Amino acid sequence: MVNMKASMFLTFAGLVLLFVVCYASESEEKEFPREMLSSIFAVDNDFKQEERDCAGYMRECKEKLCCSGYVCSSRWKWRVLPAPWRR
């Protein structure tokens, strides 16, 4: 069982190494490691959290308005989901 796990790990590591070597041979730039790391860890603007004018779930009830679907709890003083007993 252990030999099978080790051989699978080595096979996977070999495939990853083969991919990196093939990609490096096709790359014409000298700064391959930096380019590879920057492409792996690049952050797209679509994934960044955007600022909103309303406050969401479990946020403190102060000057910001509640987002649609939330109400300000009079007991706990934060935003919660509306329920029949909270209306």
Swiss-Prot record:
Domain notes: The presence of a 'disulfide through disulfide knot' structurally defines this protein as a knottin.
Signal peptide extent: 1-24
Disulfide bonds: C54-C67, C61-C72
One example GO MF annotation: toxin activity
Primary residence: secreted
Highest taxon listed in the record's lineage: Eukaryota
Entry protein name: U3-theraphotoxin-Hhn1b
Propeptide: 25-52
Cellular-component GO terms for this entry: extracellular region
Pfam families per record: Toxin_12
Tissue: Expressed by the venom gland.
Species this protein is from: Cyriopagopus hainanus (Chinese bird spider)
Family the UniProt entry places it in: Belongs to the neurotoxin 10 (Hwtx-1) family. 51 (Hntx-8) subfamily. Hntx-8 sub-subfamily.
Location(s) in or outside the cell: Secreted
Classification via InterPro entries: Huwentoxin-1 (IPR011696)
Keywords, sorted A to Z: Disulfide bond, Ion channel impairing toxin, Knottin, Secreted, Signal, Toxin
Function summary: Ion channel inhibitor.
